[in-house]
Amino acid sequence: MKSTHSKIKIAHVQLMPLLSGVQRVSLQEFELLPNEQFDINLICKESGPLTDYLDDSVRAFFVPTLCRNISLIKDMKSLISLYKLLKKEKYDIVHTHSSKTGILGRIAARLAGVPCVVHTVHGFAFESTKRKSVKLVYKWLEIFAAKCTTRLICLHNEDKEICIKELYVDPMKISVIPNGVDLEKFAPAINKGDLKEKILGLKRNSFVFTMVGRLWPQKNPLYFAEAAKYIIENNLIPDSVFVIVGDGELMNDLKYNYQTDMNLKKRLLLLGWRNDIPNILKASDVFVLPSLWEGMPLAILEAQSTGLPCIVSNINGNNCLVKNEFDGFLIELNDIDSFINALVRVTDDKVLNIMSKNCRNKIVNGFNIVKRVDKIKDLYIDMVVNK
């Protein structure tokens, strides 16, 4: 049992040092957990936007062999490096994120004798895998890693049910703690037209659809771009502009397929990584996220807090945040016609205004970041004191 008068030493294990959803969830905790109670470290592959953003009180350690794809040699090297680091630093808690680092980090933590091992479920990779053999391997690894876990944090009840029924996790080991939003930082715009001119360089009357996320297959940005192309070429929504914020492996595909035509280039904007996401959302009218799988997307919550109706794929993680035709539209990934139809329908002023109010009210009443971090803090303290 650890005294509550000494600092609790925690290592958060991530893969990439980006500022996408998973990393920003951790960053919220780093910023809001009291320094007098917690000594927080970050372990990731290398330096990057996330580590550049860290407060001086947060130390960063790097494991260069960490990678997203399965590589037996690199994964074994990463496991050994993590084990040595965790053993040396003598953490009270190791808190892992995402599938790959979640598995390696939890196994290494158990081998290193870390007393408390926490994992936040940000969706399951095996849920979106079509190959049965790959799905089976991913699921087996998750089951094994769950045996190394003191506490699982699920962002919604759907993932909790998957943990219980498919990974055989004891329900008493699971806490459901939804993501949260800074309500002041992500408040609705006072003058949206001014922000469209100032932030995006667009006309005040532009109708802006925005997607924010890492440009890789999971986020499915090409699906959004294809729908945008059809709408632009057929002039279905006059003055519409489609904005994609983020970077990643699919950026070149987006440029090659959707930026060679000048009319498309003017109305399908690829902004790359940006540090002014709150202002970009405030300058937008609708948020779009056609992901293949999710945990609980912080990007959706931030967009809703800003008053943006959301058009998102009908998958676990998304469909617990968006109620169809109440605060947005749920679209099926194999039906681009219904996706395009939803993009057109949401431009109706009455629909837009009602959904916008519903979005903001829901976030204010149920997804406050301060309350979320308080729950995380209580969980940490309870685990360490009672271990």
From Swiss-Prot:
GO terms for biological process: O antigen biosynthetic process. GO terms for molecular function: glycosyltransferase activity. It catalyses: N-acetyl-alpha-D-glucosaminyl-di-trans,octa-cis-undecaprenyl diphosphate + UDP-alpha-D-galactose = alpha-D-Gal-(1->3)-alpha-D-GlcNAc-di-trans,octa-cis-undecaprenyl diphosphate + UDP + H(+). Coiled coil: none annotated. It comes from the Bacteria. The keyword Magnesium applies. Its EC number is 2.4.1.343. Its cofactor is Mg(2+); Mn(2+); Fe(2+). Keywords: Glycosyltransferase, Iron, Lipopolysaccharide biosynthesis, Magnesium, Manganese, Transferase. Pathway: Bacterial outer membrane biogenesis; LPS O-antigen biosynthesis. CDD domains: GT4_CapM-like. PANTHER family: GLYCOSYLTRANSFERASE (PTHR12526:SF630). Activity was assayed using the synthetic lipid carrier analog alpha-GlcNAc-diphospho-decane (GlcNAc-PP-De) as the acceptor. Involved in the biosynthesis of the lipopolysaccharide (LPS) O-antigen region. Catalyzes the transfer of galactose from UDP-galactose to GlcNAc-undecaprenyl diphosphate via an alpha1,3-linkage. Has strict substrate specificity. Belongs to the glycosyltransferase group 1 family. Glycosyltransferase 4 subfamily. This is UDP-Gal:alpha-D-GlcNAc-diphosphoundecaprenol alpha-1,3-galactosyltransferase. It comes from Escherichia coli. The gene is wclR.
